[in-house]
């Protein structure tokens, strides 16, 4: 279902999206083929995975798995075409290309197959066959790459663990993540992330899937397949990453597209390579990204779906596929993903719902669709799956040799990274984180798969990866944002007209979003945004509500609401300008206009904004994906929310909803629609559950964030600083209130949501802050913004708001969804610029960085002061988000990274960000990027300071890890072989001895007289030793035989 839309979207989206989509679709196909349900995803994933992994990683396990995957692949080919011609295409293309690399890389992976996972997994795999198979694959991959992949993805996945839990999901997630990774390595990140996330969520999501079903529904399917595939995908992805992305390509194809697209563009095929990193990021974020994608996917199902697909298609795709498929699962995950991505498991995990989780993905994570679908998202099913919390444990248990495919290619060097064992610190955290992640990821989820990831991240991206991915994506988003930033900046100028500013921001966000979509992050963002947008649009009513809010806001000046709406809507409205850009937007646009209308007060501003937006669009032009993205964002967003919600829902049912709900106020308007599904389900919990929220938040944030951001943005600068502080307090304070407040202040809520989204924990805090701030602020744009900011800071979403409010939101969302969150913030900060640029480069953090600069400017204004706080907050948030989002990726490492990283990041980031903010927007951007890149890496990156460095550092780190893993593998293998040899020799000796004894015994028996024998027997029975000689001889033989038996047996 998705597919078609996807296709359409893809088509619309364009090759990129196409590719992206493809990926997604591929996933679908994957899903179809791979697991039937998962198969599509799987297919893609599997295809990718299968293909690549098959030969490579999974050879053994692979074989088991692979077959299905391959089937998936095959199927993929065939399957996709129908539904996903695009996908197929992409996949094919990707597949083809990447595949080869995949193979190569994969081979590498194959090298170490050891993985505990394998057997069990395989069994499971087999058991699930698709799912499991995929899972297995993942696992296999895990073993091999997968481990790594899984790690990444699993991270997402695992992170999401859910994946494991899901088993299927896990596979999915992992696989997805992997696949995604591969696929989306770039996109993968998303995808994986998202998917990852979603995957985990997947299962959860599935129900949600339904929710999303409408949107997510497909996801659901997707979700499943996706998941499978996702896993596969992931796997593939991972491979891809590893392989390059070859796998990626395959699955990645699409995902890559998105990322790849971006990446592709950048890397093009590279997808494997370069993009991979982003992918990785994506991957990491992947989940998230995935999620994102997922989200998109979910979107796809819906209009958004298409949009999403379109916009973020690739990412989305993946996500969608993964996320979409997954995402939905993931969706929350990010699944939608969120997360990946957030949610999606993020996408949601984000992407979870975010992507899936958010739709997760996301963040994983990552991202969800599936999850989304499944979860909500299933979304991000993969991601989400990853996010699936349960799995985390399992995953955790897995040895995660994770391949951090964050930057897959980059890490080509060492493909293995044992990221963390995933032991799931994630498990617990993962789950939560996952949730978040998912949300984030799902909003990323990554794969997790995040997707946050694997997002490696996914989610980490998966997490790291995911995160990275997410980051990347986010960054991408950022890029988009960046693009927006320009606008923003401009807007900032217009800031005075805060509304416009806000709007601008919103736009930016939107743009950002759009770009987001481009980027995975973007996608995620997009998703988020889209979702929101879509939501907004979809929800025209919501929209209206938003408008109301807008009005409210408007009064406030924040308009954020409007923005929110506007942002979403507005954005949409603005988007209208962009509208053109965003096709999907069209639909939205209409709503948007309404929004605009509501905006009227703001309108002018809006107009400006709109006009600006055009600028943005222009900027976006670069981000042109943006438009598409934008839609997608809407779509995405929507999905994301869904996913997210879903994811959340799956994950935290509440959360999803909460987010939604919270956002509901606004987002609801916006998100609602999407969330409605997802959210709705979750709404109640949502708030509570940050996770869902995150995604939602993401979505919402985008809306809310946007709104808030938007409105705030202008203010932000001013408010920013204080807000930051404020926010924090607020955040903390308002934890409870937030929900109410959130609702209350739609914008606020939204922001809150964003905030909440950020991290469940955070979220609350975030929420609180945001709310508080928001609440207070709502009236005041600044306040809001601040809150948003605070939120942003606190939360990714918040971050989003913060940086771009909108952007950030978006980003945040994305971020939320995935690492993105982290990213987001940074992204936002940077992203805006990034986005514009990134479109192509997006992948490249670098670019983003660059872009970011501008953004930074804007951001700086806004974030500047805030940035720092933001940073810190961001970091926290980000970390959080990332952790969450990243969780996929991070997730694996999140605790570590998150905890440690977070802090580090916080401080570092803060500093870095600050610094960056201050002077180096770029730096900041870089930092941000870095963040995004990998939260973990972030830290490192922070050090690096440059986006690039971030990427590089991440890569370096990944490489090192991979190398270490390889070493470990080698040693392990040697050790095992030696042990085996020794045992064999011992057995031989025992056998010889035994035979000797037997002979001796026979001889003795022969020689002995019956009497003696009888006597001996009696003695033996009594235990009295007969003649020493005889007994011994006699006795020994028996003993020996026993030994022998055991020996032989052994």
Swiss-Prot record:
Comp. bias (Acidic residues): 134-143
GO terms under cellular component: cytoplasm; cytosol; mitochondrion; nucleus; plasma membrane
Phosphoserine, modified sites: 265
Region (Required for interaction with TGFBR1 and promotion of TGF-beta signaling), start-end ranges: 1-99
Record's compositionally biased regions (Basic residues): 217-241
InterPro entries: TSC22/Bun (IPR000580), TSC22/BUN_CS (IPR047862)
Membrane disposition: Peripheral membrane protein
Induction note: Induced by follicle stimulating hormone. Induced by isoproterenol-mediated myocardial fibrosis.
Comp. bias intervals (Low complexity): 38-55, 85-97, 458-476, 906-919, 1021-1050
Segments for region (Disordered): 22-111, 126-285, 445-479, 511-531, 581-609, 720-740, 795-847, 879-919, 1015-1050
Family annotation (Pfam families): TSC22 (PF01166)
Signal peptide start-end: none
Compartments (UniProt record): Cytoplasm; Nucleus; Cell membrane; Mitochondrion
Protein keywords: Cell membrane, Cytoplasm, Membrane, Mitochondrion, Nucleus, Phosphoprotein, Repressor, Transcription, Transcription regulation
One GO term of the biological process aspect: positive regulation of apoptotic process
Tissue expression profile of the protein: Ubiquitously expressed, abundantly expressed in testis, ovary, uterus, and lung. Expressed in cardiomyocytes.
The keyword DNA damage is assigned to this record: no
PANTHER family cross-referenced by the UniProt entry: TSC22 DOMAIN FAMILY PROTEIN 1
Function noted in UniProt: Transcriptional repressor. Acts on the C-type natriuretic peptide (CNP) promoter. Acts to promote CASP3-mediated apoptosis. Positively regulates TGF-beta signaling by interacting with SMAD7 which inhibits binding of SMAD7 to TGFBR1, preventing recruitment of SMURF ubiquitin ligases to TGFBR1 and inhibiting SMURF-mediated ubiquitination and degradation of TGFBR1. Contributes to enhancement of TGF-beta signaling by binding to and modulating the transcription activator activity of SMAD4.
Subunit structure: Forms homodimers. Forms heterodimers. Component of a complex composed of TSC22D1 (via N-terminus), TGFBR1 and TGFBR2; the interaction between TSC22D1 and TGFBR1 is inhibited by SMAD7 and promoted by TGFB1. Interacts with SMAD7; the interaction requires TGF-beta and the interaction is inhibited by TGFBR1. Interacts with TPT1/fortilin; interaction results in the destabilization of TSC22D1 protein and prevents TSC22D1-mediated apoptosis. Interacts with SMAD4 (via N-terminus). Interacts with ACVRL1/ALK1, ACVR1/ALK2, BMPR1A/ALK3, ACVR1B/ALK4, BMPR1B/ALK6, ACVR2A/ACTRII, and BMPR2.
Record-given protein name: TSC22 domain family protein 1
Organism expressing this protein natively: Rattus norvegicus
């Amino acid at each position: 279902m998705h597919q078609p839309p996807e296709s359409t979207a893809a088509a619309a989206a364009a090759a990129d999206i196409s590719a992206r989509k493809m990926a997604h679709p591929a996933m679908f196909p994957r899903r179809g083929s791979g697991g039937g349900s998962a198969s599509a995803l799987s297919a893609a994933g599997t295809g990718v995975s299968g293909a690549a992994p098959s030969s490579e990683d999974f050879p053994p396990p692979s074989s088991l798995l692979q077959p299905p995957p391959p089937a998936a692949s095959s199927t993929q080919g065939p399957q996709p075409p129908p539904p996903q011609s695009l996908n197929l295409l992409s996949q094919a293309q990707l597949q083809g290309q990447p595949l080869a690399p995949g193979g190569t890389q994969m081979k590498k992976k194959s090298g170490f197959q050891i993985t505990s996972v394998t057997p069990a997994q395989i069994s499971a795999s087999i058991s699930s066959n698709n799912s499991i198979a995929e899972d297995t694959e993942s696992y296999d991959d895990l073993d091999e790459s997968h481990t790594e992949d899984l790690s990444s993805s699993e991270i997402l996945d695992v992170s999401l663990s859910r994946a494991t839990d899901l088993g299927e999901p896990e596979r999915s997630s992992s696989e997805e993540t992997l696949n995604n990774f591969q696929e989306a390595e770039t996109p993968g990140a998303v995808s994986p992330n998202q998917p990852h996330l979603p995957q985990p969520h997947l299962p959860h999501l599935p129900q949600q899937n339904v929710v999303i079903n409408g949107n997510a529904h497909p996801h659901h399917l997707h979700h499943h397949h996706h998941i499978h595939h996702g896993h596969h995908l992931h796997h593939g992805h991972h491979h891809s990453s590893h392989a390059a992305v070859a796998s990626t390509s395959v699955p990645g194809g699409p995902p890559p597209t998105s990322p790849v697209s971006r990446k592709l563009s950048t890397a093009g095929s590279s997808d494997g390579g370069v993009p991979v990193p982003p992918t990785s990021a994506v991957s990491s974020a992947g989940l998230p990204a995935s999620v994102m994608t997922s989200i998109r996917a979910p979107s796809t199902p819906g209009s958004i779906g298409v949009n999403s697909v379109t916009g973020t298609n690739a990412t989305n795709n993946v996500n969608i596929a993964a996320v979409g498929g997954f995402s939905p699962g993931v969706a929350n995950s990010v699944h939608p993903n969120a997360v990946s991505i957030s949610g999606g498991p993020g996408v949601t995990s984000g992407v979870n719902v975010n992507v899936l989780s958010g739709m997760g993905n996301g963040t994983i994570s990552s991202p969800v669709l599936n999850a989304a679908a499944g979860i909500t998202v299933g979304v991000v099913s993969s991601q989400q799956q990853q996010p699936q919390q349960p799995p985390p444990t399992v995953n955790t248990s897995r040895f995660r040799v994770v391949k951090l495919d964050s930057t897959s290619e980059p890490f080509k060097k060492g493909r293995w990274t044992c990221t963390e064992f995933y032991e799931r610190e994630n498990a617990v955290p993962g789950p939560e984180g996952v949730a978040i992640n998912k949300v984030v990821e799902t909003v990323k989820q990554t794969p997790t798969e995040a997707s946050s990831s694997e997002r490696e991240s996914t989610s980490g991206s998966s997490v790291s990866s995911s995160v990275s991915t997410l980051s990347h994506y986010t960054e991408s988003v950022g890029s988009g944002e960046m693009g927006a930033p320009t606008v923003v900046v401009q807007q900032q100028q217009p800031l005075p007209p805060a509304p416009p500013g806000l709007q601008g921001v919103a736009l930016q966000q939107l743009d950002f979003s759009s770009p987001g979509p481009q980027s995975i992050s973007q996608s995620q963002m997009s998703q988020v945004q889209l979702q929101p947008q879509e939501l907004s649009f979809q929800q025209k009513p919501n929209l209206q509500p938003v408008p109301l809010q807008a009005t409210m806001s408007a009064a406030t000046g924040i308009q954020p609401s409007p923005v929110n709406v506007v942002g979403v809507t507005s954005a949409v409205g603005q988007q209208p300008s962009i509208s053109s850009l965003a096709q999907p937007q069209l639909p939205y646009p209409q709503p948007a206009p309404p929004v605009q209308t509501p905006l009227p007060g703001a309108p002018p501003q809006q107009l400006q904004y709109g006009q600006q937006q055009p600028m943005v669009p222009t900027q976006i032009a670069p981000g042109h994906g943006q438009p598409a993205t934008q839609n997608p964002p809407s779509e995405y967003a929507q999905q994301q929310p869904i996913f997210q919600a879903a994811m959340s829902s799956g994950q935290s049912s509440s959360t999803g909803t909460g987010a939604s709900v919270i956002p509901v106020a606004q987002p609801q308007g916006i998100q609602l629609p999407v969330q409605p599904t997802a959210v709705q389900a979750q709404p109640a919990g949502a708030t509570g559950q940050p996770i869902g929220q995150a995604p939602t938040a993401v979505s919402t944030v985008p809306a809310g964030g946007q709104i808030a951001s938007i409105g705030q943005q202008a203010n932000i600068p001013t408010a920013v600083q204080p807000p930051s502080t404020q926010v924090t307090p607020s955040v903390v304070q308002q934890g409870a209130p937030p929900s109410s407040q959130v609702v209350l202040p739609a914008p606020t809520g939204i922001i809150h949501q964003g905030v909440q989204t950020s991290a469940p924990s955070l979220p609350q805090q975030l929420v609180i802050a945001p709310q508080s701030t928001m609440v207070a602020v709502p009236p005041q744009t600044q306040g809001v913004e601040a809150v948003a900011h605070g939120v942003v800071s606190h939360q990714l979403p918040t971050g989003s708001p913060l940086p771009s409010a909108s952007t950030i939101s978006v980003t945040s969302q994305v971020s939320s969804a995935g690492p993105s969150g982290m990213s987001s913030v940074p992204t936002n900060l940077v992203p805006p610029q990034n986005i514009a640029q990134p479109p192509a480069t997006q992948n490249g953090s670098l670019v983003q960085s660059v872009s970011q600069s501008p953004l930074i400017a804007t951001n700086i204004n806004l974030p500047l002061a805030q940035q720092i706080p933001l940073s810190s907050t961001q970091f926290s948030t980000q970390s959080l988000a990332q952790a969450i989002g990243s969780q996929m990726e991070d997730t694996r490492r999140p605790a570590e990274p998150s905890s440690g990283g977070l802090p580090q990041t916080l401080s570092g980031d803060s500093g870095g960000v600050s610094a960056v903010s201050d002077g180096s927007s770029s730096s900041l951007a870089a930092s941000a990027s870095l963040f995004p890149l990998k939260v973990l890496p972030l830290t490192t990156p922070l050090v690096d300071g440059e986006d690039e460095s971030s990427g590089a550092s991440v890569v370096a780190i990944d490489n090192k890890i991979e190398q270490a893993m390889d070493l470990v593998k080698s040693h392990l293998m040697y050790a095992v072989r030696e042990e085996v040899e020794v045992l064999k020799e011992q057995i031989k000796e025992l056998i010889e001895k035994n035979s000797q004894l037997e002979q001796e015994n026979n001889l003795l028996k022969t020689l002995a007289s019956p009497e003696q024998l009888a006597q001996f027997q009696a003695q033996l029975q009594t235990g009295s030793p007969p003649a020493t000689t005889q007994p011994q001889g006699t006795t020994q033989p028996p003993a020996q035989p026993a030994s022998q038996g055991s020996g032989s047996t052994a």
